[in-house]
Structure formats: C-alpha cells, structure tokens
Design a protein with these regions (language model features):
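Alpha-helical transmembrane bundles and membrane-interface segments of multipass inner-membrane proteins
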Residues: 1-156
C-alpha cells in the first residue's frame, strides 16, 4: 500500500508542480522551444477532455472525474486485496492523472496543458500535460496486459 501511495503522491505532485511553474513563468499562449519545432513548452488552457477532445460545452467533467477517482480507488483496494500489486500501481498512476486534471478543473475551470510535440507548426499532437501522460501510459500498459492475458488463455 505504501508503494501505491508513493507512486500516486509523486506523480500527482509532479503534475501540480509542472503546471504551477507553467502558470507562474509562462504567459498564456507563450511557448519555449526545447528541441526546435519538435518539442516545445506551450501554455494553453483546455476546457475539454484528454487531448482536447470535446464532449460538449456543458459536459460534467468534474462529476465524471470524481466517479473515476472513486472507481480507481476501489480498483486499487481490490488489487491490493488480491495481491495484484502491478495492477494497483498502474491504477495509482491513472489516479494521479485523473486527480491532477480534476484539481485544475476545480481551481481554473479548465486544464493547464503545456507539453507540445510535433514535426512542424501544422503537424502537431494536441498539447497535453503530466496528468494526461499518466492516464494514457497507465491505461495503455493495463490494456496491453489484459490483451496479453486474454490471448495467452485463448491459445491454451
């Protein structure tokens, strides 16, 4: 349980710290090029969901986030109970991301995004943040594990 809490605390804190630094030192709409056009820090605000996908102007993002947090905590506790520590750790990574973006929505009514990756000014991935990365990476690894287990059972 301590490792799960540590993973959550470190990633949540990293998300909050990076967003704080962006808000404090980089005016909205400004950018800092780290590796030419490929990697930039760009301060944008996102009223939508992951990767700027819109679910509608009045979509209850905070309510959905709270439901996700409760669900993830239940998954973590169940994983710990069944001694599936890898799943518990993955759910803690996802939880840190959800909690980080919900904290933004509560405080700013939108999410602070700043990681800007692309090949040119017109060929870019949607700007994202540490929380988005936690959600995406955690879910990707979890789904790969589920698929691997499914195909292993199917081949027997």
């Amino acid at each position: 349980m301590k490792k799960v809490l540590l993973i959550f605390a470190l990633l949540f804190s990293l998300d909050r710290l990076t967003k704080y630094l962006v808000v404090k030192f980089l005016p909205l709409g400004s950018e800092i090029r780290l590796i030419g056009e490929f990697v930039k820090i760009t301060h944008v605000r996102n009223p939508h969901s992951l990767w700027s996908i819109s679910l509608g102007r009045n979509f209850p993002y905070i309510i959905l986030g709270v439901v996700a947090i409760v669900f993830l905590i239940a998954l973590i506790l169940d994983s710990i109970k069944s001694k599936n520590i890898l799943n518990a750790n993955l759910f803690a990574v996802i939880l840190a991301g959800v909690a980080g973006n919900i904290a933004d929505r509560v405080h700013f009514r939108e999410v602070i995004d700043f990681i800007d990756i692309g090949l040119s000014p017109t060929l870019r991935w949607p700007v994202f943040n540490v929380a988005d990365s936690c959600i995406s990476i955690g879910l990707a690894i979890y789904f790969i594990m589920v698929l691997k287990e499914y195909f292993a059972k199917r081949s027997q």
